[in-house]
Amino acid sequence: MFLFPAIDLKDGACVRLKLGLMEESTVFNTDPGAQARDFAAAGAEWIHVVDLNGAFAGKPVNGAAVDSILKSVSVPVQLGGGIREMATIEDWLARGIRRVILGTVALKNPALVKEACQRFPGRVAVGIDAKGGKVAVEGWAETSDLTVLELARKFEDCGVAALIYTDIDRDGVLAGPNVAATAALADAISIPVIASGGVSSLVDLKALKAYPKLEGVISGRAIYDGRIDVAQAIALLKA
């Protein structure tokens, strides 16, 4: 199982949000490239990056910060936030992003996801963010009537590399991940699932590791708060 240390970008800096609220952000590092280097030095095999401004704007905003991350590390980077068009997907992959994460567009234009998977095999992930079990989009500002499983099943046979499942009600509050919902989703679909939201300790990582269908786990605030040591977490997940 992989650990995906998270870099959430707002106005060019590494921040963490609480419950997905932009006004509830805390700056942890003003140099995203340096943060990425720290993660790579600790043994991270992937880095998870989100363009928060982009998620709300519907187009990339923190391009310079993402480029600084790509220049700073050789480990693969997956990126989400504001990726809504094929031209944007092409651009990010050409710039060195290993895997793009499609969120809002997966709900609003699933055909684009399927086309991207055909054109870029293994380089397209779907991000499903849930609030009360229902899919949330537009930077979590809007909730749909679709359940997580209903949306996930739309992409079962089109070659999606991974499904990143975030429980917004737990994100950035260190309340522990929604292990039951995440495990149930992983059991119900054939796409590898990456858990996100609420991870607060090595105990939480152990709980998720018990489910072999999970490909990995994303952690942000717990790392920045010093509750999780990246090297220790990787050793635990690899053991």
Curated annotation (Swiss-Prot):
| Localization per record | Cytoplasm
Q: What is its main location?
A: cytoplasm
- Identify the enzyme class: isomerase
Single GO cellular component term? cytoplasm
Q: Which residues cross the membrane?
A: none
Q: Please provide the record's keywords in A-Z order.
A: Amino-acid biosynthesis, Cytoplasm, Histidine biosynthesis, Isomerase
Q: Which Gene3D superfamilies match?
A: Aldolase class I
Which EC numbers characterise this protein's activity in its record?
5.3.1.16
The protein's name: 1-(5-phosphoribosyl)-5-[(5-phosphoribosylamino)methylideneamino] imidazole-4-carboxamide isomerase
Write down the species: Paramagnetospirillum magneticum (strain ATCC 700264 / AMB-1)
Gene that specifies this protein: hisA
